C-alpha cells in the first residue's frame, strides 16, 4: 500500500507538475531530430574555416608593396 502524501508531499508534487508538461518533454527533440548534430557540425566547420584562413593568410612581411594613399584635394 502506498503511504498518503500529506500536505508536504502534495505541495512538492504540485510544484513539480510543470516538469511533465508535454511541451517540455522530448517533443521538441523529436520534432527537430537532427538539429543538435547539425549545429555542432556547423560550429566545427566555422572553426575549421577560421584555422584554414589563418594558416593560408599571407604574412605582412611577405608583401613588399606599400599602399599609396590618394592625395586629398
Curated annotation (Swiss-Prot):
Where does the protein principally reside?
Answer: mitochondrion
| TM spans (from-to) | 31-48
**Membrane topology per the record?**
Single-pass membrane protein
Protein origin, superkingdom: Eukaryota
Task: State the organism of origin.
Answer: Arabidopsis thaliana
What name does this protein carry?
Answer: NADH dehydrogenase [ubiquinone] 1 beta subcomplex subunit 3-B
What's the subunit arrangement here? Complex I is composed of at least 49 different subunits.
Family from the record: Belongs to the complex I NDUFB3 subunit family.
Q: Which classification does the entry list for the species?
A: Eukaryota, Viridiplantae, Streptophyta, Embryophyta, Tracheophyta
Q: Name one GO cellular component term.
A: mitochondrial inner membrane
Biological process terms from the Gene Ontology for this record are: electron transport chain; photorespiration
Amino acid at each position: 500500500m502506498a503511504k498518503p502524501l500529506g500536505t508536504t508531499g502534495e505541495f512538492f508534487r504540485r510544484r513539480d507538475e510543470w516538469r511533465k508538461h508535454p511541451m517540455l518533454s522530448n517533443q521538441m527533440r523529436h520534432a527537430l531530430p537532427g538539429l543538435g548534430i547539425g549545429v555542432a557540425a556547423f560550429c566545427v566547420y566555422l572553426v575549421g574555416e577560421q584555422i584554414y584562413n589563418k594558416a593560408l593568410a599571407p604574412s605582412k612581411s611577405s608583401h613588399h608593396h606599400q599602399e599609396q594613399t590618394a592625395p586629398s584635394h
